[in-house]
């Protein structure tokens, strides 16, 4: 197991905010009912969709082989 140092990059949200297009983008997104994924009175599994991708941006450097 090898540990990789992660660095946080500028998120898509930050980049869109700088360009002044974030508010328009978010207004055009469909509204989703967060409770719709739960089936009440049912023993089904509730799935949590990964949709908050605007705030996530991490990268790490990986090198393979010898220089």
Curated annotation (Swiss-Prot):
Its UniProt entry gives the catalysed reaction(s) as: Degradation of gelatin, little activity on hemoglobin. Specificity on B chain of insulin more restricted than that of pepsin A. Does not cleave 1-Phe-|-Val-2, 4-Gln-|-His-5 or 23-Gly-|-Phe-24
Q: What molecular functions are annotated in GO for this chain?
A: aspartic-type endopeptidase activity
- Pfam families linked to this entry: A1_Propeptide
Q: Name one GO cellular component term.
A: extracellular region
Does the record's keyword annotation contain Cell membrane? no
Q: Which EC numbers does the record give?
A: 3.4.23.2
Source organism, top-level taxon: Eukaryota
Keyword annotations for this protein?
Aspartyl protease, Digestion, Hydrolase, Protease, Secreted, Zymogen
Question: What residue stretch is flagged as signal peptide?
Answer: none
Instruction: For this entry, list what GO says about its biological process.
Output: digestion; proteolysis
Q: Where in the cell is it found?
A: Secreted
Q: Which residues form the propeptide?
A: 1-43
Protein family: Belongs to the peptidase A1 family.
Q: What is this protein called?
A: Pepsin B
- This chain's source organism reads Sus scrofa
């Amino acid at each position: 197991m090898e540990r990789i140092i992660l660095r946080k990059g500028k998120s898509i949200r930050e980049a869109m905010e700088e360009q002044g297009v974030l508010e328009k983008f978010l207004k055009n997104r469909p509204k989703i009912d967060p409770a719709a994924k739960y089936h009440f009175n049912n023993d089904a599994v509730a799935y949590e969709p990964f949709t908050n991708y605007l705030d996530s941006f991490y990268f790490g450097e990986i090198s393979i082989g010898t220089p």
